[in-house]
Regions:
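Short conserved micro-motifs at the rims of enzyme active sites and ligand-binding pockets
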Residues: 69, 129-130, 153-154, 247-250, ...
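Duplex nucleic acid-engaging cores and interfaces of nucleic-acid transaction enzymes
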Residues: 1
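Histidine-centered nuclease catalytic patch
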Residues: 228-262, 275
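A cross-family structural signal marking well-folded subdomains
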Residues: 4-193
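C-terminal, well-folded lobe of enzymatic/effector domains
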Residues: 294-342
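Short Cys/His-centered divalent metal-binding micro-motifs
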Residues: 259-288
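Hydrophobic alpha-helical segments
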Residues: 121, 125-128, 144, 148-151, ...
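Intrinsically disordered, low-complexity N-proximal targeting/linker segments that flank membranes
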Residues: 149-238, 246
Length: 342
């Protein structure tokens, strides 16, 4: 009826039914959903996202990637089946890519929208033997990925055009067909002030949390790395180094106390030991639980991009200043370009 507009999935279902009455797009999607369901990080990939990926892949091979509604509706059943088979594989490769960067659950993925072009880029690069066989190629892919996150370029509603452009430009750049840096990398900029304004629902917040873990941060109590094998046991979160109560008692503004600069990955049982105390008090308690020697414990603390001496002294202003400088370097390295020091 005129009152109920069919979504693109329902329209394509009708299109495919004219080609093959026995084919059910809904049943086919359920099988795709089951395959992607092996990885919690892919939980927000919906059926329209998947059709967008199919369209981007098919059109990019034909000349230029496109993933708008009309592009999806131009797909033939043969186009769909061929691309769907590849994308079921490359979405799993995308989940592995995320896992290696310590993004294991849906809450840890900065932008689900960025996973659509990433899966398509993996499929396109598979057309070229050994396209990802060099460190340089992976460096390029990493740079694009982190620029998308810290530039917050996949956080808006209008990402289809960016996705299409990235599929074409990033693929060509990694394959060495062009020296031109993709527009997403050129567009990306990170302002230092974002350290104080991002909150839990932000891609930058999740990006910094993941980057700390991926760069080797270890749990203070167990000295274990945060990875797919230790996650179920550690149940980590991005917790405050200087607890909220301590910050309030010491006149620290909430905007500073709540910032990512005052957060670090901790296992659930580590965070419990902290219990509102200053580092000067809680560090000895954590170390006792860890059974580590002084030098070993200091090494573990140091994996968190922080100055251990300032932490032991509970010197919050200098701790924050030092960590801001370290975090800035970390973000600039990931993006491959300088940040705005505002």
């Amino acid at each position: 009826s005129a009152g109920l507009q069919m979504d693109v999935f329902e329209l394509l279902t009708a299109v495919f039914a004219t080609e093959d009455p026995d084919f059910s797009l809904a049943e086919d999607w359920e099988e795709t959903r089951r395959i992607l369901g092996r990885y919690p990080a892919l939980d927000r990939i919906n059926r329209t996202d998947f059709l967008t990926a199919v369209s981007l892949l098919v059109t990019s091979r034909a000349g230029h990637a496109a993933g708008q509604r009309e592009d999806i509706l131009n797909l033939t059943l043969a186009d769909y089946l061929h691309a769907r088979r590849e994308l079921r594989t490359t979405f799993l490769e995308t989940a592995e890519f995320l896992s290696q960067r310590c993004m294991l659950t849906i809450d840890q993925v900065p932008y689900t929208a960025q996973l659509i072009p990433l899966a398509v880029i993996f499929a396109r690069l598979a057309d070229t033997p050994r396209a990802l066989a060099s460190t340089k190629a992976w460096d390029k892919l990493n740079q694009w990925f982190w620029c998308g996150i810290f530039g917050e370029l996949y956080g808006s509603a209008a990402v289809i055009n960016r996705s299409a452009r990235d599929v074409d430009q990033v693929t060509a750049w990694i394959e060495g067909r062009t020296e031109e840096v993709p527009k997403t990398i050129r567009d990306a900029s990170f302002s230092e002030s974002r350290f104080f304004s991002v909150r839990e629902n932000s891609g930058v917040y999740q990006g910094i949390y993941a980057l700390l873990m991926a760069r080797g941060a270890r749990d203070w109590r167990t000295s274990q790395p945060f990875d797919r094998w230790t996650f179920p046991e550690l149940q980590p979160g991005f917790h405050r180094v200087f607890p909220q109560e301590w910050c309030r008692d010491n006149g620290i503004e909430d905007v500073v106390a709540d910032s990512v600069l005052n957060r670090t990955p901790m296992g659930k049982r580590t965070e419990v030991v902290i219990d509102g105390y200053a580092p000067t008090r809680y560090l000895s308690r954590v170390q006792t639980k860890s059974l580590l020697e002084d030098s070993e414990f200091d090494t573990v603390l140091g994996t968190h991009e922080l100055n251990t001496d300032l932490l032991y002294q509970s010197d919050f202003p200098n701790f924050l200043r030092d960590r801001r400088s370290r975090f800035l370097g970390m973000v600039e390295y990931a993006m491959g370009k300088p940040a705005l020091r505002d």
